[in-house]
Design a protein with these regions (language model features):
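Extended hydrophobic leader/signal-anchor segments used for secretion and membrane insertion
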Residues: 1-164
Length: 164
């Protein structure tokens, strides 16, 4: 069993390296706690180019709208055209309370955002430690959200899919 797991990890690493060299995948290091407990500082993830409209729960990598070259990793909670309301610690999309099994802590402060057809509303899973999400920087333009996180490859004990 141990050798088959090692072989699988070597195969995965080879595939990641090959695809990354061909520009189909991107490696990314998680540097902050805003996505904990899903993603922790020191985790390494794989992202693929985002080709279709994001779904609620997808984790995206996008450039900070006010700091060129600085990228953020956040989860989609509001979809294009929706109204997102944060009230009494809960997130609502078009008047429905969202089930957010990934969220760590209540969502504050209260507010209302009407999303344009080409924008999404993103939040960090660790709501108390996520300063660079849509509560503070506004909705994210889909043009800027170029990468979708699809898996974690480090640490070895946490290898696998991430997201929903």
């Amino acid at each position: 069993m141990r050798s088959s797991r090692r072989l699988a990890l070597i195969g995965t690493a080879t595939l990641v390296a090959y695809a990354g060299l061909r520009g189909r995948l991107r490696r990314y290091e998680i540097a902050e706690e805003s996505m904990a407990p899903t993603l922790l500082p020191g985790d390494y993830v794989i992202a693929q180019p985002r080709r279709e409209s994001p779904q609620r729960g997808d984790i995206l990598i996008f450039e900070h709208p006010h700091q060129a070259g600085f990228e953020l990793v956040k989860r989609v909670v509001g979809l294009p055209g929706e109204q997102v309301v944060i009230a009494r610690g809960q997130v609502h999309a078009n008047d429905a309370v969202l089930a957010e099994p990934w969220a760590d802590g209540p969502t504050l402060p209260d507010g209302t955002w009407n999303l344009d057809p080409d924008h999404v509303f993103v939040l960090g899973d660790n709501r108390a430690r996520s300063a660079g999400d849509s509560r503070w920087i506004g909705p994210v333009n889909l043009h800027d959200a170029r990468w979708k996180v699809v898996g974690r490859y480090w640490p070895l004990g946490s290898v696998g899919r991430v997201g929903l």
